[in-house]
C-alpha cells in the first residue's frame, strides 16, 4: 500500500482511481521482490525519526509514561517533595535520544510541556504549544524551498501529541475541550486517561463514554481519523481503536517479580498493577498504536495533511505559489513576517545540521 495516496486535505474527497493496467505475462523470474530487501537495508542504515509531544497537567505521569513506552530512561522527572516551584508560564522542553533494537535505529524526540493547565488563569495557555508545532513546520518549509538543500531535511515536526486527561471521572473540562479543538487541526492527537488505576473498571468505562460524547459534540477529530481509512482492513482495525479511545493507561518504569517473571508495574499494598496486562490497563493499546502498527501512518498524515495545509497557507501568505510551469520564487519572508494561520509570530532560530545517519 502506498502511504502517499492521501488527499491533501481531510475536506476533499478522494479522486476516482484510473482503470488498472492489466498485468503483463512474465516468462520467468525477474527478481522484483528484491526491492523489498533493498528498502529494508536502506531503512536500517538511515534509521527512523519520530517526534512525540506529551501535554497535560503536572503529576499525571507524562515522563513515566514515555519511559514505559520505550522501555528506557528517556525522560527523568523531578521527584516530589524537593520544593521545585511551579512554572509561572508554560515552558517547552525537548530531548532527543537514539534507541536501537535489533539493528533498527529510532531517533526519538520527546517534547514535554511543564506548566500547562497549572495556573489559576489558563487563558491562551495553548498558544506556546501551537506556536511550537507551527514553528517546526516553518523550519521544514524554509529548508524545503531552498535551491540547494540537504539531501535529507532534518524532521523536527511533531508527529503525535499524547494528551493526558485527568482521571476526574466526570467529563472533559472546558480547558480540555478548547485546547483539543485547536490542537486536532494542527497535529495528530491521541487522548489518554492518566493514572487510570485511581478509577474502578465501571468508573473508567463510564468516564470513557462521556469523553467520547464530548469529542463528538464539539467536533474534535482525534487520531485515527475516520476519513483517512484507506481500505477495509484499516476500517476494521481503526474502528476498534476508536471505540477504546481515550485509552486508560498506567505508567511504570520499575520491574517486579510476579509468578516467577519480571513485569513492568506499580506496586501497591493491594498488589502489582501490570502495565502490559490488559486486565489492569490499556497501555498495550497505546504502545501498539504509537509504535507497532501506526508509527509510519502518523508520520505520513503529519507530512501529507497537517504540514501540507500549513505549507499551502504559508505560500499563499508569502506569494510563493508558482505562477506557471517552472516558476517559483524562493525568497523567504523576513522573520518578523512569518506568521502562522493563527497569527503566531515565528522567528526561525539556528538549525541543527545533523547528519542523515545517526
From Swiss-Prot:
Which gene is this protein's source? SEPTIN12
Q: What is the recorded phenotype of mutating residue 197 to N?
A: In SPGF10; results in significantly reduced GTP hydrolysis due to impaired GTP binding; disrupts interaction with SEPTIN7, SEPTIN6 and SEPTIN2; absence of SEPTIN12, SEPTIN7, SEPTIN6, SEPTIN2 and SEPTIN4 from the sperm annulus; disrupts interaction with LMNB1
Some GO term, biological process aspect, for this entry: which one?
A: protein localization
Organism for this UniProt entry: Homo sapiens
Residue numbers spanned by region Interaction with SEPTIN7? 46-319
Q: Where does GTP bind?
A: 56-63, 89, 115, 195-203, 251, 266
Task: Check the record and name the InterPro entries matching this protein.
Answer: G_SEPTIN_dom (IPR030379), P-loop_NTPase (IPR027417), Septin (IPR016491)
Any one GO MF term held by the record is: phosphatidylinositol binding
Q: What is the lineage of its organism?
A: Eukaryota, Metazoa, Chordata, Craniata, Vertebrata
Q: What protein is this chain from?
A: Septin-12
Tissue and organ expression note: Widely expressed. Expressed in lymph node.
Amino acid at each position: 500500500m502506498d502511504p502517499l495516496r492521501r488527499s491533501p486535505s481531510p475536506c476533499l474527497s478522494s479522486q476516482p482511481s484510473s482503470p488498472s493496467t492489466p498485468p503483463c505475462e512474465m516468462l520467468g523470474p525477474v527478481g522484483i521482490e528484491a526491492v523489498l530487501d533493498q528498502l529494508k537495508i536502506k531503512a536500517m542504515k538511515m534509521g527512523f525519526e519520530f517526534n512525540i509531544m506529551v501535554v497535560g497537567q503536572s503529576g499525571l505521569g507524562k515522563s513515566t509514561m514515555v519511559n514505559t513506552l520505550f522501555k528506557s530512561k528517556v525522560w527523568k522527572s523531578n521527584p516530589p517533595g524537593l520544593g521545585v516551584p511551579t512554572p509561572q508560564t508554560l515552558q517547552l522542553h525537548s530531548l532527543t535520544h537514539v534507541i536501537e533494537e535489533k539493528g533498527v535505529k529510532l531517533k526519538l524526540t520527546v517534547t514535554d510541556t511543564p506548566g500547562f493547565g497549572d495556573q489559576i488563569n489558563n487563558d491562551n495557555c495553548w498558544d506556546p504549544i501551537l506556536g511550537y508545532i507551527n514553528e517546526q513546520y516553518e523550519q521544514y518549509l524554509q529548508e524545503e524551498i531552498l535551491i540547494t538543500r540537504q539531501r535529507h531535511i532534518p524532521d523536527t515536526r511533531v508527529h503525535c501529541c499524547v494528551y493526558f486527561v485527568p482521571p476526574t471521572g466526570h467529563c472533559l473540562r472546558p480547558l480540555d475541550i478548547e485546547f483539543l479543538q485547536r490542537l486536532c487541526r494542527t497535529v495528530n492527537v491521541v487522548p489518554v486517561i492518566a493514572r487510570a488505576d485511581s478509577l474502578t473498571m465501571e468508573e473508567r468505562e463510564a468516564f470513557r463514554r462521556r469523553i467520547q460524547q464530548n469529542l463528538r459534540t464539539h467536533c474534535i477529530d482525534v487520531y485515527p481519523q475516520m476519513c483517512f481509512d484507506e481500505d477495509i482492513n484499516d476500517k476494521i482495525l481503526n474502528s476498534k481503536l476508536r471505540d477504546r479511545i481515550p485509552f486508560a493507561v498506567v505508567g511504570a518504569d520499575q520491574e517486579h517479580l510476579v509468578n516467577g517473571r519480571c513485569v513492568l508495574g506499580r506496586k501497591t499494598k493491594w498488589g502489582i498493577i501490570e502495565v502490559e496486562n490488559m486486565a489492569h490497563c490499556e497501555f498495550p493499546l497505546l504502545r501498539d498504536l504509537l509504535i507497532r502498527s501506526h508509527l509510519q501512518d502518523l508520520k505520513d498524515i503529519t507530512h501529507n495533511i497537517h504540514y501540507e495545509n500549513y505549507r499551502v497557507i504559508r505560500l499563499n501568505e508569502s506569494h510563493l505559489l508558482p505562477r506557471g510551469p517552472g516558476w517559483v520564487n524562493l525568497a523567504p519572508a523576513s522573520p518578523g513576517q512569518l506568521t502562522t494561520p493563527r497569527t503566531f509570530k515565528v522567528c526561525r532560530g539556528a538549525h541543527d545540521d545533523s547528519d542523515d545517519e545517526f
